[in-house]
């Protein structure tokens, strides 16, 4: 969800070792806060109705919440029932949390957590190829802005689940999406019916709200889809790497690239190439201009009409970022 507005003048960044806040000042980005450094953070969301209300998920300790832009953090009471939390989705009046083993929970306006049972049932049967002993997890959550009750859940590994009734019931996506290792999902806000999915073996596109899919991985050796986003002008972005993360410590690194499409995902052009770290998360830029690009090397780059430039470096590996207050 695009947080680029007058109140969203800070970048909130989740990493392998804590949360960071950077503020835009005089053309550069300055670190203003750091917290939760004992925790590996897996996801981050900013409340769409309050840019100072920030949620982060941790690998083993559930959620932390701040209502003042990160000055103070506390655990929700009660915390999410399964503390290995991998995915968050902040919606007006509610927060959804996806976990490992794969399950999905929702809390409305600070109330108790309710499990949305269809995700646990729909995610059965998946296993993670590099480590088959690991069961499936909810990797990513997304909402269709054009169809508010339609939700998407990426299961790693187990494919994609879709709900058309605000999470009460879920069904598996099967038509054309033949990669069960789904990392991120983007329902376009500007292109009716278009949905993108970044997967372990490539990138997929749907033009009918996720009912049918076609593989659209840009030509070249990069096949590992890691991230997808859309700016306020409707440009679509995807991050792809040469291979899976367990290869990124080799001499050639991730050799990642950022691709952009201005026609709803029909044609793609390379915007950045040769990025050392994998492009783990993207978020829309300020004033609808381009995107922020975060990497597994702890860098944040800004890409817009002026080109690409590194604005933050030296952080732990980044897992998520969002604009907020």
Model-derived features: positions:
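Extracellular glycan-interacting surfaces
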Residues: 1-325
